[in-house]
Amino acid sequence: MAHNISAIAHWALKVPDLDRTLAFYRDKLGFPEMLRLTLDNGQLLVYLRITDTQFVEIFPNGKGNEAPDEATTAVNHICLQVPDIDKMIAHLEAQGIPIWRPKKLGLDGNLQCWVRDPDGNRIEFMQMLPGNMQEKAIARLSSS
C-alpha cells in the first residue's frame, strides 16, 4: 500500500442544512452520531460512524443549495460497499430515498445503485461480486 496508507478514514461534507443532512445520513442511512465538536471559530462539526474506523464529517453553514453537477471538477461521488445490494435497495426505498440510478451490473463486474443526498451529492452503493475487476487487479498486482 502506498506510503502505508491503510484506509480512507472519513469524508467531509459542507452542507447548508445540518438537520436535513442528519435526517438523511443518521436517520435514514443509519450512520450513528459519534460526536460533536466545536472548532476554534465556533463552527460545529458532527461525526457520523460508517464503520468502526470510517466516518463522515458534517460541516454546517455551507453556501449554495446543491452539489456540483457530474461534469464539474470536484469530488464526483462516494461509494459505500454493502454485502447485499437488494437489501440495501429495500432499506433505501423503505426510508423514502429515491433510487437515482437503478441496480445494474457495472463495468467492473459489481452490482451498483445510486442515490443523491438532500444536497445532491451522489452516493453509489456497491456489492462486490466474485471475479470482479478489482479482485483480478489485486491478484495481478500481488503476483508481480
Residue ranges and their predicted role:
Residues 1-8, 32-79, 89-116, 129-144:
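Vicinal oxygen chelate
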Residues 21-26, 92, 120:
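Conserved active-site tyrosine of GNAT-family acetyltransferases
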Residues 125:
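Short glycine-/small-residue motifs
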